[in-house]
UniProtKB/Swiss-Prot annotation:
Catalyzes the conversion of the cyclic tetrahydrodipicolinate (THDP) into the acyclic N-succinyl-L-2-amino-6-oxopimelate using succinyl-CoA. Belongs to the type 2 tetrahydrodipicolinate N-succinyltransferase family. Its EC number is 2.3.1.117. Keywords: Acyltransferase, Amino-acid biosynthesis, Cytoplasm, Diaminopimelate biosynthesis, Lysine biosynthesis, Transferase. The keyword Transferase applies. It comes from Helicobacter pylori (strain ATCC 700392 / 26695) (Campylobacter pylori). This is 2,3,4,5-tetrahydropyridine-2,6-dicarboxylate N-succinyltransferase. Pathway: Amino-acid biosynthesis; L-lysine biosynthesis via DAP pathway; LL-2,6-diaminopimelate from (S)-tetrahydrodipicolinate (succinylase route): step 1/3. Succinyl-CoA binds at residues 271, 286, 289, 312, 327-328, 335, 364.
Length: 401
């Protein structure tokens, strides 16, 4: 039977109507009662690029064309109905025994088995007859055309399936609706206003945690590595990436926006703005800010290299190479004027061959962007910004990571 399944997949992939996916998965959606907009789309399993193309063949051959809710060259959203569930299970017959006995096996089958339970318990649709489960297929990385595709891209970033800054997130703010979040549930703001009196009189008014277009990171996924620590769930937005283990985020002034994050072991007590990528081994001190691209006119995404130290309350508006230090309270922006003495310039030139010498020893911050081994400091006697070759080795406390 397994060979029959393989032949089915192979034949489908060679057919004229086969279209290779960038990503696909089944999502459960939350629908606003008044506007009917999608407030949230939750994917228990995300298949990215060439992952699980057998399940892609199953899903595409189980859907009903009349159930297509949205279709374009770049994405497709299809309603899950009874026919889809039963057809998919029939295709999956060779693997069902293993899936029933091991919940960690065949994750896409596990999703369909949960859909079967929803079918049996009459939960495929809400009380208004609207489908709560959708098959979502992303074909091309184009601007987001639906909430479902926006959530798929954010999840791909958070899981590390797509590198930070690699996906087209244009239009994402227009697709997502501002909602009141209580626990993992989004509430339509207009619905809350309309029903405020009744909800409060019956003591059913939800405890609202926050209002935003984005859910929090921990509301959508479990970190893949056990040594990732988030001490305050409100400080990390969905769409952030926290690396391959050892990331620690302290409470207080720390924050990570979507499409930003750390690549590995990192101590973060500061703010990692949108599109910022932080290298492994870097320590971001309390209240330190790394500027992003969402506002303020900065269109150049910032990267922080490996084994850097951003001191408390520092501001970094340029990219840093490996082994850099920005002292506490120091602001380094693209237009900042920084003095480098001639002997220190020679030391920096040893690790930055492209560095160009200025006769007056003054350099703009943007000229030092991405350079390795630079230590930025404010001269306490005259207030000048200075830079010199960093000789301090940045080592994180291994017991904390």
């Amino acid at each position: 039977m397994i060979n029959k399944f393989k032949n089915f997949v192979s034949n489908y992939q060679q057919s004229n109507h086969y279209k290779e996916p960038l990503g696909f998965g089944i999502a459960r959606v939350d629908i606003a009662p008044i506007s009917k907009k999608i407030l949230c789309a939750t994917y228990p399993v995300l298949n990215w690029k060439d992952e699980n193309l057998g399940s892609y063949a199953v899903f595409c051959n189980s859907l009903s064309k009349e159930k297509i809710l949205k279709e374009s060259a770049s994405e497709r959203v299809i309603e899950i109905d009874e026919s889809f569930v039963l057809k998919a299970l029939d295709f999956y017959t060779p693997f069902l025994n293993e899936a029933y006995s091991n919940k960690m096996a065949h994750k896409n089958i596990q999703v369909v088995l949960e859909l079967l339970k929803a079918l049996e318990e009459n939960r495929l649709k809400n009380s208004d007859g609207e489908s709560l489960y959708r098959l979502v297929i992303l074909y091309e990385d184009k601007p987001c055309e639906s909430v479902e595709s926006a959530y798929m891209k954010l999840l791909a970033l958070s899981l590390g399936k797509a590198p930070l800054r690699s996906l087209n997130l244009e239009g994402i703010f227009n697709q997502l609706s501002n909602a009141a979040w209580s626990g993992n549930k989004p509430y339509e703001l207009e619905w809350l206003r309309m029903n405020e009196v009744a909800l409060k009189m019956r003591d059913h008014f939800p405890s609202i945690d926050f209002i935003d277009k984005f859910p929090r990171y921990l509301m959508q996924l479990i970190p893949e590595f056990d040594n990732i620590r988030l001490l305050d769930s409100s400080k990390t937005r969905f769409g952030a990436y926290l690396g391959t283990g050892g990331y620690t985020q302290m409470p207080g002034a720390s924050y990570v926006n979507f499409n930003a994050g750390a690549m590995g072991v990192c101590m973060n007590e500061g703010r990692i703005s949108s599109s910022v990528v932080v290298g492994a081994g870097t320590d971001i001190g309390g209240g330190a800010s790394v500027l992003g691209v969402l506002s303020g006119g900065n269109n150049n995404p910032i990267s922080i290299g490996k084994n850097c130290l951003l001191g408390a309350n520092s501001v970094t508006g340029i990219s840093l190479g490996d082994g850099c230090i920005v002292d506490a309270g120091v602001a380094i922006l693209a237009g900042s004027v920084i003095e480098i003495e001639e002997n220190e310039f020679k030391k920096l030139l040893e690790v930055n061959s492209a560095l160009e010498k200025h006769a007056n020893n003054l350099y703009k911050g943007k000229e030092l962007s991405g350079k390795n081994g630079v230590h930025f400091r404010s001269n306490s006697q005259n207030g000048k910004l200075i830079a010199f070759r960093s000789v301090k080795k940045i080592e994180l406390n291994q017991n904390l990571h």
